[in-house]
Amino acid sequence: MAAVVALCRKAMETVKTKEFRDYLASTHFWGPVANWGLPLAAFRDMRASPDIISGRMTTALIFYSMAFMRFAYRVQPRNLLLMACHGTNIVAQSMQAGRYLNYHYGGGTTAATTAAVSAASATSTGSVDSSATSTGSVDSSATSTGSVDSSAATTPAAEDPVAHSNCQEITCCYLVTWDCD
């Protein structure tokens, strides 16, 4: 208990010094405080859908943070708060980059699209799709015809949002998205 009291006393003495007040009024403090918004936003977006992640911006933020992390270490006096902020941002952006790569190149998009297209084709054509046969569910009208529809999930028109008549292409900041009603 005495060690905690001594630590608190030492912290209070440090806070009361002119050097600490000058530090709180400097850009060495407020610059990193403002920069903490980047990693905090990245960690908050971990729960968001990975289709909103911009691969270009994530890559740019990783390189930006690496450059400023080196700067924070090399500048005199060293700005360890800025270095910690950018180190955290590198971790957060790397996690977002992993989510982006997994979604766009690791099967995240294809699996979601294939499941949606297979479900839609099974209900509209009355046939059994490849995912339904693997789970053991069979449409009652498909049992009479005995047809299996595995081509619907692999056709380019099934994965292309433009093929649907109620979709609009929206281009903003080098990111192309589809707005479907």
From Swiss-Prot:
Source organism: Bos taurus
Segments of this protein annotated with the region Disordered: 125-154
Annotated localization: Mitochondrion inner membrane
Annotated keywords: Membrane, Mitochondrion, Mitochondrion inner membrane, Transmembrane, Transmembrane helix, Transport
Function of the protein: May mediate the uptake of pyruvate into mitochondria.
GO MF, any single term: pyruvate transmembrane transporter activity
Organism superkingdom: Eukaryota
Membrane topology of the entry: Multi-pass membrane protein
GO cellular component: mitochondrial inner membrane
InterPro entries attached to this UniProt entry: MPC
Chain ranges passing through the membrane: 23-42, 52-74
Pfam families found in the cross-reference section: MPC
Name listed for the protein in its UniProt record: Mitochondrial pyruvate carrier-like protein
Similarity comment text for this entry: Belongs to the mitochondrial pyruvate carrier (MPC) (TC 2.A.105) family.
A GO BP annotation: mitochondrial pyruvate transmembrane transport
